[in-house]
Curated annotation (Swiss-Prot):
<dbReference type="GO" id="GO:0004725">
    <property type="term" value="F:protein tyrosine phosphatase activity"/>
</dbReference>
<comment type="similarity">
    <text>Belongs to the protein-tyrosine phosphatase family.</text>
</comment>
<keyword id="KW-0904">Protein phosphatase</keyword>
<feature type="domain" description="Tyrosine-protein phosphatase">
    <location>
        <begin position="1"/>
        <end position="112"/>
    </location>
</feature>
<protein>
    <recommendedName>
        <fullName>Tyrosine-protein phosphatase 7</fullName>
        <ecNumber>3.1.3.48</ecNumber>
    </recommendedName>
</protein>
<dbReference type="InterPro" id="IPR029021">
    <property type="entry name" value="Prot-tyrosine_phosphatase-like"/>
</dbReference>
<feature type="binding site">
    <location>
        <position position="82"/>
    </location>
    <ligand>
        <name>substrate</name>
    </ligand>
</feature>
<dbReference type="InterPro" id="IPR050348">
    <property type="entry name" value="Protein-Tyr_Phosphatase"/>
</dbReference>
<keyword id="KW-0378">Hydrolase</keyword>
<dbReference type="Pfam" id="PF00102">
    <property type="entry name" value="Y_phosphatase"/>
</dbReference>
<dbReference type="InterPro" id="IPR000242">
    <property type="entry name" value="PTP_cat"/>
</dbReference>
């Protein structure tokens, strides 16, 4: 589906319990079966983090498919409380605007 943007609004832990699996490497590269995920860049802001990944399908040779690599941007909102909704809406609205304007017409849907 040519997805290039992932929006994450939960943290990995909630009240000390695992809420979401970390599907990206802390640094460097990790292999998940035939998909290689390389963390390229991390930008930390007050209410969110932007991570850039390079995904590579190692099952496909470069000669067989020129589409075996893809750049993914992950927008991770870090201020969602463990219970309820955010107290202040403006940081969340800014996050939604920033994460949605980066999508290009060639991109697939934004995955939330």
């Amino acid at each position: 589906n040519n997805v290039t943007i992932i929006v994450m609004i939960t943290n990995l832990l909630e009240n000390g319990r695992k809420k979401c699996d970390q599907y990206w490497p802390h640094d460097g590269r990790e292999q998940y079966k035939h998909i290689s995920v390389t963390l390229r860049d991390v930008d930390i802001y007050a209410n969110y983090i932007v991570r850039s990944f390079q995904l590579r399908n190692t099952k496909l040779s470069k000669r067989r498919s020129r589409n075996n690599e893809r750049r993914i941007l992950q927008y991770h909102y870090t201020q969602w409380p463990d219970h309820g909704t955010p107290e202040y809406i403006l940081p969340l609205l800014k996050f939604i605007r920033i994460s949605s304007v980066v999508s290009s017409p060639e991109s697939g849907p934004i995955v939330v």
